[in-house]
Amino acid sequence: MAIITVTAQANEKNTRTVSTAKGDKKIISVPLFEKEKGSNVKVAYGSAFLPDFIQLGDTVTVSGRVQAKESGEYVNYNFVFPTVEKVFITNDNSSQSQAKQDLFGGSEPIEVNSEDLPF
């Protein structure tokens, strides 16, 4: 059994809303593999339900086993119990800055005798 992991951005093209017994849910369809340049192979897409906290524009990672299901003349590929996680991407391209805070609470330096030091 192979696990497929795909990262994609949820947008209007690859996300749709369906009505279920538990209310409206979003489904994302993502390509299961990349098409090679010049290849005539049709790319298979896998679908997975998105958690409610995922919004359009969010980048998500979908990971899980994919199961094929025939529906008439078509074959639908669905993730079975997938793990869907939101990928957090910062909007700035600057280097990561360190938090500047006084770890000692702004206290004054303490005078210590060299005789009291263990070294």
From Swiss-Prot:
Cystine residue pairs: none
Region span, Disordered: 96-119
Induction profile: Expressed in the early phase of the viral replicative cycle.
Superkingdom to which the source organism belongs: Viruses
GO molecular function, one term: single-stranded DNA binding
Entry keywords, A to Z: DNA-binding, Early protein
Signal peptide range in chain numbering: none
Record note on quaternary structure: Homodimer; two homodimers can further weakly assemble into a homotetramer.
Family note: Belongs to the skunalikevirus SSB protein family.
Protein name in the entry: SSB protein
Organism: Lactococcus phage p2 (Lactococcus lactis bacteriophage p2)
